[in-house]
Amino acid sequence: MKIRIDIPHHPYDIQIEKGCMAQAGQWLRELWQPQKVVIVTDNHVASLYAEKVKLSLEDAGFQVAVFDFLEGEERKNLTTVQKVYEFLVKQGLTRSDGIVALGGGVVGDLAGFVASTYMRGIHFVQIPTSLTAQVDSSIGGKTGVNTPFAKNMVGTFAQPDGVLIDPLVLETLGKRELIEGMGEVIKYGLIEDPELWALLTGLNGSVESILEHAETLIXHSCQVKRKMVVEDELDNGIRLYLNFGHTIGHAIEATAGYGKVMHGEAVAMGMVQISKIAEEKGLMPAGITQSITEMCQKFGLPVDYENWEVDKLYQALTHDKKARGNTLKLVLVPELGSATIHPVSLEEMKDYLVK
């Protein structure tokens, strides 16, 4: 299956196909002329797939080097970026060469940021290996790294030349790593896709059910992401809907310490908390919080953060990238399959942190 991201200045395709990683070289050869390529990955993904992808690219005529770093959200920072820059220089990469981001969201965000800033920008592609990356972070051109102040505080908008998604690689994920990706999938059903929500309702929540329906779940999610990215590439309007649950979710990630709470887990807890208060305020329909809670719990996602400290979470919220002056653009779901922007003051945002 191919999904076209038809952005006028930089259109590209998402290819979703079981087993397609084995043809990575052929796929990339259709996008780029033979040239130097650096695969950026983490040590865990490298042990599983780096050699396989490297050989496929070399068979297609590319000169390939591999840079890997220790896995984990806590490594998504400017220190790691500097190390990648140094490696690219040593490999002699020029503006006519490219980067292959092979890994989950941390790898994709960091490698995309490096590609968009090295020599003012070189080509890159995404080969995502986690469910979160396959349904969300590899698509749409947001890149970034964390700072001690906030998640993804330093970043760019830079579209890849293509995204290659192999659902079979999800079979090598640990249970927690697979399940956390369902936080984003559930979000897509809530904000835009009632058909996806119905599909999720029919699943029993097991790892086996996720893997069995992975290709369909990924396709639905990518279609929602495609629509919002094409209409609003730079995140000024409809694309903000994708941030449902993320305002509080990012604050949870930051206060917990990067890597302690996984992104999809934080999104799940954020969606439940936002919905609970919005429902109490009459801004979301009665019963929707219970529906979201039950859906998250069915797939094994957490719905409550045990280290809830309002002051720390509020401090993290003040660094939210969606803030404009003293106003936050909060995303709510007034009905299943529909989202809206609800501007709130930073002061009012404290209401949404009350347990």
Swiss-Prot record:
Which cofactors does the annotated protein need, by name? Co(2+); Zn(2+); NAD(+)
Where is this chain's protein located in or outside the cell?
Answer: Cytoplasm
Pfam families on file:
DHQ_synthase, DHQS_C
List residues binding Zn(2+). 184, 246, 263
In its UniProt record, which GO terms are filed under biological process? amino acid biosynthetic process; aromatic amino acid family biosynthetic process; chorismate biosynthetic process
What name is this protein filed under?
A: 3-dehydroquinate synthase
Gene responsible for this protein? aroB
Q: Name one GO molecular function term.
A: metal ion binding
Q: Which GO terms describe its cellular component?
A: cytoplasm
What CDD domains does the database record attribute to this sequence?
Answer: DHQS
- State the free-text cofactor note: Binds 1 divalent metal cation per subunit. Can use either Co(2+) or Zn(2+).
